[in-house]
């Protein structure tokens, strides 16, 4: 099995942040985002990485960013290492395929979730309240049902190791401002509807997904990642059957395994068997091939 890239360390480059998956380097006016093979579940980073996961996430994000350019601009300057600043070139072998040279935007203080199907925390909320983030839904929905129309459900941005909290659209307006929140909501729904139709033709259901936005030179742009198996629920269309959980092309497979363990969902993470690592990697790769027609 290929050795995963768990951490990066590039002498001469300033490490600005190390998140659950991405290492971010400050290049002055721009940023270098390196997507590692780290994987987290329940907000805990696993000890093992998933080989090629960083490559898959970067390529899927780049694919969707290109598809959505008619709706909103994104933060990418280039994904071709040859275009990166000269101080990045000594590390080209590690950076190739798993990194982005991006604009330095001011992130909005909310994460923007759109749900086209009822699953996960949304399903739990619906069971107890009949609503998600205060949005009342029809009675009688089953787990994994398609919603009558997609809904926008923002959340707070949590610190590393803590959980995001769902908030109402009205609360987002108080945090970010009504004008920008309304634009973000409209753009998020437009992106989702276009992506849902594209993915449907490729045999994938995008049940829900999460976006991050920023302001760059006074303009709203989309940043971070875009509709990857880390930020989305991807279900195989050919086996879709409402009334329960769905098989998926994302890390739900890993979550399901962890749910079978006597583990409190706090660090340290339990060791992952090689089979779980391999099968998780296969699901990520399958999503890339189905969407883009290309593998490694």
Swiss-Prot record:
Catalytic reaction list: 5-amino-1-(5-phospho-D-ribosyl)imidazole-4-carboxylate + L-aspartate + ATP = (2S)-2-[5-amino-1-(5-phospho-beta-D-ribosyl)imidazole-4-carboxamido]succinate + ADP + phosphate + 2 H(+)
Keywords tagged on the record: ATP-binding, Ligase, Nucleotide-binding, Purine biosynthesis
Gene3D superfamilies attached to this UniProt entry: ATP-grasp fold, B domain, Phosphorylase Kinase, domain 1
Pathway: Purine metabolism; IMP biosynthesis via de novo pathway; 5-amino-1-(5-phospho-D-ribosyl)imidazole-4-carboxamide from 5-amino-1-(5-phospho-D-ribosyl)imidazole-4-carboxylate: step 1/2
GO aspect biological process, one term: 'de novo' IMP biosynthetic process
GO molecular function terms listed in the Swiss-Prot or TrEMBL record: ATP binding; phosphoribosylaminoimidazolesuccinocarboxamide synthase activity
Keyword ATP-binding among UniProt keywords: yes
Transmembrane segments: none
Gene Ontology CC terms: cytoplasm
InterPro entries assigned to the protein according to its UniProt record, in alphabetical order: SAICAR_synt/ADE2_N (IPR028923), SAICAR_synth (IPR001636)
Entry EC no(s): 6.3.2.6
Family: Belongs to the SAICAR synthetase family.
Stated name of the protein: Phosphoribosylaminoimidazole-succinocarboxamide synthase
């Amino acid at each position: 099995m290929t050795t995963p890239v768990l951490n990066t360390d590039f002498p001469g480059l300033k490490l600005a942040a190390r998140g659950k998956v991405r290492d971010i380097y400050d290049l002055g006016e721009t940023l270098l985002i390196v997507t590692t093979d780290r994987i987290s579940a329940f907000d805990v980073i696993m000890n093992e990485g998933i080989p090629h996961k960083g490559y898959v996430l970067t390529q899927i994000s780049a694919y969707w960013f290109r598809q959505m350019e008619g709706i909103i601009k994104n933060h990418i300057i280039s994904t071709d290492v040859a275009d990166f600043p000269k101080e990045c070139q000594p590390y080209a072998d590690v950076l190739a395929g798993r990194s982005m040279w991006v604009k330095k935007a001011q992130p909005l203080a909310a994460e923007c979730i759109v749900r086209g199907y009822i699953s996960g925390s949304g399903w739990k909320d619906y069971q107890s309240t009949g609503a998600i983030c205060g949005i009342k839904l029809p009675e009688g929905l089953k787990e994994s049902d398609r919603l009558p129309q997609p809904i926008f459900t923002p959340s707070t941005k949590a610190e590393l190791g803590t959980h995001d909290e769902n908030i109402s659209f009205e609360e987002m307006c108080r945090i970010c401002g009504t004008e920008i929140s309304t634009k973000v909501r409209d753009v998020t729904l437009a992106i989702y509807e276009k992506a849902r139709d594209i993915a449907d033709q490729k045999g994938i259901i995008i049940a829900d997904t999460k976006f991050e936005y920023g302001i760059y030179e006074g303009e709203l742009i989309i940043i971070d990642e875009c509709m990857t198996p880390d930020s989305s629920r991807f279900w195989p269309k050919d086996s879709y059957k409402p009334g329960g959980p769905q098989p998926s092309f994302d890390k739900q497979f890993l979550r399901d395994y962890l749910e079978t363990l006597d583990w409190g969902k706090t660090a340290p993470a339990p060791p992952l068997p090689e089979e779980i690592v391999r099968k998780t990697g296969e699901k990520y790769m399958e999503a890339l091939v189905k969407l883009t027609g290309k593998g490694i």
